[in-house]
Design a protein with these regions (language model features):
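Conserved micro-motifs of the catalytic ATP-binding
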Residues: 122-127, 165-168
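Short helix-loop "hinge" at the ATP-lid/N-box region of the Bergerat-fold HATPase_c
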Residues: 184-185
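Short conserved segment of the HATPase_c
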Residues: 216-230
Length: 280
């Protein structure tokens, strides 16, 4: 009887481990037997639960990837087929080739973003932090988007000022600022404003990037940094883009030792605030 009380729970745990090893992430071991075996079963079950969560996230991630890839591919194929079979008249070919080019670029950015996220979350991207002026990065990003800003008749405010030193990886910070400014340009109406502000607070530098426009619905604010989140429920962030840019921002800011959040007054403005270690 004593042997059965010991071997029974061990056999149960062994069977659960076999099922888990075969890919059944719902496998759990009964928590019974002596204290040591019960503790072991609890530890096993906690591990199995974590693996199940990871597997579910992976499945959702792959489903989102498939959906995001399918959309531009469908558009590209449809327009190319239309040009080949004559549905699209020759005089309109240039226009639709332009759309195909845009969708191809979107596809390339999506693939690059997914590769970036995979490497960042796996800790495979080295951090090369250094002390430098934050405003140089902000200015470089704005200048790189100068044509889009002019086309959108957007007013830029708060750019420049005295040097403000941060200690961070310049590539990380450039990507964060670029992604936020890219969103701001997309959602700022003609004649609207994108403004920049930054100041040192203790051993951190707080950066604020704000744009006028529809803003983000209050119920959407907690989710804007989630992977693949695209705000269908808010007028401030629609389905344009991959839903990966702000998620990448959060990862990069956190890796840099800072934090990021969004603020908004729906119908008026949206502001992204993030912190970075101050340079000495």
């Amino acid at each position: 009887v004593l042997a059965k009380r010991i071997t029974g729970p061990i056999e149960d745990i062994s069977e659960a481990a076999r099922r888990l090893g075969s890919g059944d992430f719902t496998a759990r071991a009964p928590v019974d037997g002596c204290v040591e075996l019960a503790d072991f079963a609890t530890t096993f079950n906690n591990m199995a639960a974590r693996l199940q969560t990871i597997d579910n996230s992976r499945g959702q991630f792959m489903g989102n990837i498939a959906h995001e890839l399918r959309t531009p591919m469908t558009t590209i194929k449809g327009f190319i087929d239309g040009m080949l079979d004559g549905t699209i008249p020759p005089e309109e070919t240039k226009h639709y080739l332009g759309i195909v080019s845009q969708e191809t670029g979107r596809l390339a950015r999506l693939v690059q973003n997914m590769l970036d996220i995979t490497k960042l979350e796996a800790g495979e991207v080295p951090i090369h932090a250094q002390t430098y002026d934050l405003w140089k990065t902000v200015t470089d990003v704005v200048l790189s988007d100068e044509q889009r800003i002019e086309d959108g008749k957007i007013d830029i405010q708060g750019l420049g000022g005295d040097p403000l030193l941060i200690y961070a990886d310049p590539d990380f910070v450039h990507q964060v600022v670029y992604n936020i400014v890219d969103n701001a340009i997309k959602f700022t109406p003609a004649g609207g404003t994108i403004s920049f502000a930054a100041e040192r607070r203790g051993n951190m530098v707080e950066v604020r990037i704000e744009n006028t426009g529809a803003g983000i619905a209050p119920e959407a604010l907690p989710f804007v940094f989630e992977r693949f989140y695209k705000e269908d429920r808010s007028r401030g962030m629609n389905t344009r883009g991959s839903g990966l840019g702000l998620h990448i921002c959060k990862i990069l800011v956190n890796l840099s030792g800072g934090q990021i959040h969004a603020e908004s007054e729906e119908g008026n403005w949206c502001r992204f605030v993030f912190t970075l270690p101050a340079g000495q």
